[in-house]
């Protein structure tokens, strides 16, 4: 049956090379046309399942709030009055940008400052009363001329005030968004878009930068603005500025990934080209291989345009990867064809034998490799599912092209350039002489025993491999925006990006606020900011008033003339706060209330509740736990869904971790099924799967020893290594089945296997030049896995075949 199929394919190629070449040229031309219309969708929100409650809530929040996310401009300098003037000027200009919904550098906090005492916990208020009495006694002794060394009371009072100087994420001692050290002023921008829409983020950042540059040229305040993030304020009149927030961080990572892929693809192409020159040393053969490869990539991206319509931030990296992976089929074809032609001198028969034997191996290899990728199509995360579809289809397309266009090109060249076939002849005398001796593979038992011990040892470490929950290991790295974000969190006491819950009525908002105030149940919540956090319960306020009355009685004992500097400012704030009477929401200024209400154009009348998480936004383990607690909140039988950047990223993390456990296992099962169908002999699986299993175990074991971890980006490599590991074993094993000579299989196929592996490694290793942590981790994982599979294929697998042949056990059938 195989003979008939191989003969039929060979006849078609041999008799109609011109027609087939024309058809391929038309397909490539149409694919190039489609590829020219291919775009990259940078909206990462669309990669997450759109049916998730958090995604639906995000889309609704976009309508209610007119967008979500923030862009922060941090102004840094020594001249605080000048900084405030510059902040006011820039804020006014930024508000004119069409993409900007609001921009603020200050807010009237007089109400919060005057009622500060009512936002203090009762226990802390009692502690303040105790410290105040102690302070009065100390000051009385000083007034009488007695020495007092009570500095601890002053420090404790300052710490207590510092704890409550930030009410509802607003500092009450200054209307400007200025940090306690008075070195940084923040301009907070809310835009009419989402950070995941990278085209929108790019436009927003560009417009804001243009406003700052134009303002700097006019220089109305005599300030010198320059973009630089660093430690400490700038000297003299210079004000440095930096941008951060969800818009900036998301865009920087995507832009740097995009820029990183260009040199990586170039390095992959040049690296593969150089290696092919070393491997074949014949310019025309290299041109044929590279031309076929490039045409295959064009067809693949044309297929992508037709089926998916666009690339995303994950699939945009496939060009270089497919180059390294796909060239393998061409290398195996050329090696086998040259082998056959050098011995037979007949193009037709050489082509038929190549298709019959290497073509079968390539078919099984392409089927298993693509199957291991096609399983990703079932993934909920579109970054993975699209990657699986494009990469799986790309492998099949390249394999088909290598066994159609390459033969056709050789036949046409032979027709119009008869001397071309002379370049295909190789002197195989030394190999032929070695074949006649038919020596066994040396040291098979020792290699098998040593590799078995090594594999067992590495398997132990492989089981201890961990998942890296730090999302920064999957992005560009510590960019200026990320470092500035960290600094802002520390200086302004903001531990993470807030998530938002929308409620339709004031009653629902109150119940939600009370529910989230349960600190034991919501242990990953640092703070809940609601319209009701602006007006504490009246019962609590009345208790507070009683304590304040006691404090007021004692406050008159403090000599005001002894208060200076910070103590005087603190004294004035406390004194005014003590005089304030209990209040309700009706007394709170509208400027403070409107931040909790939808934009007027939404037509909705509900309220927002902000949930501020503990920990860093980059610690995905904490964001996952936070999301498990607040992602869905049930109050009186009704579900409320939180949304925000952290919630979306946590959902992505959970999907990736779940898919990462399921799909490698599915790929393994699918590979087993394909091999059983192909060989119809379970014994063959022992040999064919040796490189796969060995490569995976060695890869994971070495990763642990090098202290590397699985992360959100490199996890997609696991199915790739599975497919490639089985591919390596198939070519060697099928050659072994032809002769049942281990050394014959290695001599005639080993070089092609090694060459194909090296080109693939070059493709993945090109990611080392990306400067992107996520891409570099992908390259590292793939290089480890493929190199491990190659080492197993050239040492352990031959030893296993030789050992079983000597012992006459597990001997498979002679034909696949």
PLM regions and their residue ranges:
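Juxtamembrane segments of multi-pass membrane proteins
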Residues: 436, 443-563
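Pore- and gate-forming transmembrane helices of large, multi-pass membrane proteins
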Residues: 261, 290, 342-379, 689, ...
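Signature of alpha-helical transmembrane segments and their immediate interfacial
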Residues: 1-42, 407-412, 416-470, 816
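Alpha-helical transmembrane helix bundles of large polytopic membrane transport and channel proteins
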Residues: 23, 85-185, 204, 224-230, ...
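Solvent-exposed, non-transmembrane loop/terminal regulatory segments of multi-pass membrane proteins
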Residues: 35-78, 163-176, 437, 443, ...
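Transmembrane alpha-helices and their membrane-interface boundaries in multi-pass membrane transporters
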Residues: 306, 323-335, 359-378, 383-426, ...
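Interfacial segments of transmembrane alpha-helices in multi-pass membrane proteins
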Residues: 259-311, 379-382, 663-707, 769
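Extracytoplasmic
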Residues: 150-283, 571-671
């Amino acid at each position: 049956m195989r003979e008939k199929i191989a003969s039929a394919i060979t006849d078609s190629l041999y008799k109609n090379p011109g027609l087939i070449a024309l058809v391929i040229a038309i397909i490539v031309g149409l694919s190039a046309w489609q590829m020219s219309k291919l775009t990259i969708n940078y909206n990462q929100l669309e990669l997450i399942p759109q049916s998730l409650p958090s995604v639906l809530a995000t889309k609704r929040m976009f309508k209610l709030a007119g967008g979500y996310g923030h862009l922060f401009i941090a102004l840094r300098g020594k001249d605080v009055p000048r900084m405030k003037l510059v902040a006011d000027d820039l804020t006014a200009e930024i508000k004119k940008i069409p993409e900007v919904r609001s921009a603020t550098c200050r807010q009237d906090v007089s109400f919060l400052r005057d009622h500060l005492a009512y936002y203090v916990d009762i226990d802390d208020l009692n502690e303040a009363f105790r410290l105040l009495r102690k302070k009065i006694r100390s000051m009385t002794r000083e007034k009488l001329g007695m020495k007092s060394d009570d500095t601890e009371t002053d420090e404790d009072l300052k710490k207590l005030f510092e704890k409550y100087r930030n009410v509802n994420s607003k500092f009450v001692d200054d209307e400007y968004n200025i940090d306690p050290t008075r070195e940084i002023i923040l301009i907070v921008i809310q835009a009419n878009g989402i950070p995941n829409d990278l085209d929108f983020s790019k436009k927003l950042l560009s417009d804001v930068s243009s406003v700052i540059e134009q303002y700097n040229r006019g220089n109305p305040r005599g300030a010198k603005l320059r973009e630089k993030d660093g430690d400490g304020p700038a000297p003299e009149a210079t004000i440095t500025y930096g941008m951060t927030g969800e818009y900036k961080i998301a865009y920087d990572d995507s832009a740097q990934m995009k820029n990183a892929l260009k040199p990586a693809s170039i390095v992959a192409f040049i690296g593969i080209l150089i290696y092919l020159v070393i491997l074949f040393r014949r310019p025309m053969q290299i041109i044929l291989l590279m031309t076929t490869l490039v045409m295959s990539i064009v067809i693949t991206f044309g297929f992508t345009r037709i089926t998916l319509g666009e690339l995303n931030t994950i699939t945009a990296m496939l060009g270089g990867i497919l180059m390294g992976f796909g060239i393998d089929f061409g290398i195996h074809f050329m090696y086998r064809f040259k082998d056959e032609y050098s011995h037979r001198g007949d193009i037709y028969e050489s082509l038929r034998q190549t298709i019959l034997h290497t073509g079968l191996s390539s078919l099984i290899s392409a089927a298993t490799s693509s199957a291991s990728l096609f399983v990703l199509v079932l993934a909920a995360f579109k970054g993975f599912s699209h990657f699986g579809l494009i990469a799986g289809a790309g492998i099949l397309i390249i394999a088909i092209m290598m066994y159609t266009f390459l033969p056709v090109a050789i036949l046409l060249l032979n027709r119009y350039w008869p001397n071309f076939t002379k370049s295909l002849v190789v002197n195989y005398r030394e190999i032929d002489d070695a074949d006649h001796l038919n020596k066994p593979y040396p040291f098979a038992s020792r290699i098998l025993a040593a590799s078995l011990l090594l594999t067992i040892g590495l398997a132990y470490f492989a089981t201890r491999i961990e998942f890296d929950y730090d999302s920064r290991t999957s992005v560009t790295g510590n960019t200026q925006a990320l470092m500035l974000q960290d600094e802002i969190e520390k200086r302004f006491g903001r531990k993470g990006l807030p998530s938002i819950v929308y409620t339709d009525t004031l009653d629902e908002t109150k119940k939600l606020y009370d529910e989230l105030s349960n600190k034991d149940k919501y242990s990953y919540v640092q703070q809940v900011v609601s319209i009701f956090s602006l007006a504490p319960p009246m019962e609590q306020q009345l208790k507070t008033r009683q304590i304040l009355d006691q404090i007021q009685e004692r406050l008159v004992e403090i000599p005001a003339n002894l208060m200076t500097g910070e103590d005087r400012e603190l004294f004035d704030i406390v004194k005014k706060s003590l005089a304030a009477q209990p209040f309700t929401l009706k007394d709170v200024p509208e400027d403070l209330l409107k931040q909790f209400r939808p934009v007027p154009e939404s037509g909705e009348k509900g309220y927002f509740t902000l949930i501020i998480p503990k920990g860093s936004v980059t610690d995905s383990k904490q964001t996952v736990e936070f999301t498990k607690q607040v992602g869905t909140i049930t109050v009186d039988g009704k579900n409320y869904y939180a949304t925000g950047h952290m919630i979306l990223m946590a959902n992505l993390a959970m999907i990736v971790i779940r898919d990462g456990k399921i799909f490698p296992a599915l790929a393994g099962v699918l590979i087993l099924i394909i091999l059983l169908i192909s060989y119809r002999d379970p014994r063959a699986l022992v040999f064919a799967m040796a490189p796969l299993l060995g490569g995976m175990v060695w890869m994971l074991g070495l990763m642990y020893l090098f202290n590397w971890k699985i992360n959100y980006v490199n996890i997609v490599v696991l199915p790739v290594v599975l497919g490639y590991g089985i591919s390596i074993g198939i070519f060697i094993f099928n050659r072994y089945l032809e002769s049942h000579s281990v050394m014959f299989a290695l001599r005639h196929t080993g070089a092609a296997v090694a060459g194909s592996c090296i080109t693939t490694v070059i493709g993945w290793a090109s990611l080392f030049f990306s400067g992107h942590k996520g891409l570099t981790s992908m390259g590292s994982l793939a290089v480890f896995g493929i190199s491990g599979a190659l080492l197993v294929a050239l040492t352990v697998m031959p030893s296993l075949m030789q050992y079983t042949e000597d012992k006459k056990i597990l001997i498979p059938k002679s034909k696949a």
